[in-house]
């Protein structure tokens, strides 16, 4: 069973899993935090996102539903998003073991717990220590993501045999395929249209095929003219695209960046805020791609503004990575490291359930 806010029901249903509805905080309380995050200092952003939103508003909203579901369904184990804390409050009190499943670098996840601690400790003395001590499952490679969690278990997701080929939106062109995405969060923000327009400008004279995803809530009419080599979709199955792409251009979100590396693909990272700078730096340090710093903002402030004047830098980085085979070679080296870890099924059986089928 997957437990989450009601908005996740459709996605979970499509995946074929049972869904349990928890609560979510009112949009009127969440929207000001979401808009403030890209321009907040690192210290303020940590408080806003981790203490106020995840540790406070989201946990409070999720607790009633989580308590009811865990008490009635009695799962053998709860696998939790590291920033979903209601299950960490409820499950241990019922004798149900929990484990964190990483969505970011371990140093980021550890920092999130520290920032959320003032809100979490109101629920139970020792809760923060319990969370830190619980098994930490991650698909990220140790070479790029050392972990301070005492029980860190690395795994990989095996490829799906039922992949859907990417449709030919480019009239039979065999030019390199570039997957361009800035994740699911950007589309909710007021800066989204400007970022997408800059990325499109960087693509307009490139000899590449471009598949851009913008999210289901983004108004595509704000993009302006679309270059003929670019096709825009709200959403695609990332695994399908990565199986055919030659390059990923993205914001450096963990799911996209490490998904690309797992597929052996080099990256051009244009970080915007939060942990995207850390992810981009690690990609560049591993020689698996390039990170583009724009003319406004800086990595120390963990935010940057992307404008039209940055399009040439992005275009140059794309040309460099596509023309330099060593980037792909290093990406494939990281992919091999990730593939050498146990499968997620093996991890669940041997680590969490003690070998129970």
Regions found by a protein language model. Give the residues of each.
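A nucleotide-sugar donor-handling region in carbohydrate enzymes
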Residues: 5, 9, 110, 115-188, ...
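Glycosyltransferase specificity loop/lid
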Residues: 1-89, 94-100, 110, 190, ...
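Oxyanion-binding "anion nests"
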Residues: 195, 199
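Short beta-strands and strand-loop turn motifs
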Residues: 100-102, 179-183, 293
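Alpha-helix C-terminal capping segments
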Residues: 124, 170-173, 200-206, 351
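A generic structural signal for short, solvent-exposed coil/turn residues
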Residues: 11, 129, 147, 172, ...
